[in-house]
Amino acid sequence: MAEVINGILINEAETKNIMTKSSLPVGGYSVNPYVGCTHACKYCYASFMKRFTGHKEEWGTFLDVKHWPEIKNPKKYAGQRVVIGSVTDGYNPQEEQFGNTRKLLEQLIGSDADILICTKSDLVVRDIDLLKKLGRVTVSWSINTLDENFKNDMDSASSIERRISAMKQVYEAGIRTVCFVSPVFPGITDFEAIFEQVKDQCDLFWLENLNLRGGFKKTIMDYIAGKYPDLGPLYDEIYNKHNRSYFEALEVKAAEMAKKYDCPFVDNEMLYGRVPQGHPVIVDYFYHEEIRGTENTGKRNR
């Protein structure tokens, strides 16, 4: 029975299997405890899901709470990459009420899977007890600005301050963490400033360029024209004329930053492991849609 809670249309959805074979290059499984995402990010690539789910509502205004049969044999996924939150955020605000992600984590205990949780929330701190039991687990927070006003223009998720605080708590609990600088907005995102804030509390520092396609391209281009008119020509050059020189220059800057802070610089870091504090692995995912398989090509600064 559909109901509206705090302005969000909530439905329930039955699914035969919560574990979906992934089409991503890294393989494994994608697991999404919800359909939709109420963070309502203006640049969200996952909004394409409406084509398959039949939702007519605006992206960010609905959420389907999935129900699935209990995972009876978690060891089936031993050694597999399991990505939680590829087209939703398992820690959207409604998770506090429905608890789907916590239930999922409980069912995966003993799986020995390589679990990656992608989020923009600090609610994940609630589940540190389970994360410790899971073993090989990584938690990634998307942070592409330190400017809360810009963040608020782009999404309704947890503040940047709360995300960074959550990252610190999870890191100090002995769990591998990622700062995912995504998407990098040309002329707006200062990834070195972000790095300086988080370098002592993350194992990996991922960089990904802003991709504009589909319906949200116009949304972002109009936003830039209205809020950052001086950047209009740059965005036109990158997103209409497909000039790559800006992000190519950022790759050079990222490599220089890696040398400055004595950090590895790679272009596809997926293996599980921890690193010395203050020296996270910097991962270049610019134009990742053209990458690169599952193996690291070995592009390093040392």
Residue spans of the language-model regions?
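Active-site beta-loop-alpha junctions enriched in small/polar residues
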Residues: 87-89, 120-122, 142-146, 182-184, ...
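Surface-exposed amphipathic alpha-helices with a cationic face
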Residues: 109, 132, 165-174, 255-259
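Auxiliary Fe-S-binding modules of radical SAM enzymes
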Residues: 2-14, 192-302
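Conserved Radical SAM active-site core
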Residues: 1-138, 146-150, 160-161, 172
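Conserved strand-turn element in the central/C-terminal portion of the radical SAM core barrel
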Residues: 156, 168-189, 240-244
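Glycine-enriched alpha-helix->loop->beta-strand junction motifs that scaffold or abut catalytic
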Residues: 133-139, 199-204
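Hydrophobic faces of well-ordered beta-strands that scaffold small-molecule active sites
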Residues: 29, 82, 115, 139-141, ...
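Generic structural signal for well-ordered alpha-helices
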Residues: 102-105, 128, 163-167, 191-195, ...
